[in-house]
Design a protein with these regions (language model features):
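Hydrophobic ligand-binding cavity/cleft-lining segments
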Residues: 1-41, 144
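Hydrophobic/aromatic beta-strand elements that line small-molecule binding cavities or substrate pockets
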Residues: 5-7, 59-65, 83-90, 101
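Non-catalytic surface loops within mature trypsin-like serine protease
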Residues: 11, 52, 90, 103-105
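Short acidic, gly/pro-rich beta-turn/loop elements at beta-sheet edges
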Residues: 17, 56-58, 84, 98, ...
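Glycine-rich portal/gate segments that line the openings of hydrophobic small-molecule binding cavities
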Residues: 34-80, 92, 96, 128-144
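Short, solvent-exposed aromatic-acidic interface loops
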Residues: 77-82, 100-106
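A conserved amphipathic terminal alpha-helix motif
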Residues: 103-144
């Protein structure tokens, strides 16, 4: 499944990346743990699990490229194989975030049938992330 989605997020690029690098910031039904943390982010790897159609799926994601405040690229292995690219640029006091995914379920015959479910879950997770980043950012702003 290939998909791209661009949206405005009411948070700075630094805040967006801080959220994306937090392994505890995962949608309901998904867990993620840091397996290896690299000082320059590239090489950092995460183990993850989620359920699809009630069946637990597992895998590993590795950060393969990182330009602070601009771009992160991840490679997925296991139940989901492929790449994800997150590009962020300043936009009217917030950020314009582009999510690109080129991934598939690791079983080719099943993958084509599950692509519509995968796309829907991906879009829901992106919307969840936007809401969580904005909620987190608002809670960090000084009041007064």
């Amino acid at each position: 499944m290939r998909a791209t989605k661009t949206m405005h997020v009411d948070a700075t690029p630094e805040q967006v990346f801080s959220f994306m690098l937090d392994s505890t910031a995962t949608p309901r039904g998904m867990t993620m743990d840091v397996v290896h943390e690299s000082p320059d982010v590239v090489g950092t790897s995460y183990e993850w699990t989620f359920k699809m159609l009630g069946i637990p799926r597992k895998g590993v994601t590795v950060c393969t490229d990182y330009v602070p405040g601009e771009r992160m690229v991840f490679r997925n292995f296991g139940a989901m194989e492929g790449t994800q690219t997150e590009t962020v640029e300043p936009d009217n006091g917030g950020s314009m975030v582009t999510h690109e995914m080129d991934s598939r379920i690791a079983v080719p015959l099943i993958s084509r049938f599950l692509d519509p479910l995968l796309r829907k879950a991906w879009e829901q997770n992106i919307e969840w992330g936007k809401q969580e980043i904005e909620k987190w950012t608002k809670s960090k702003k000084p009041t007064g």
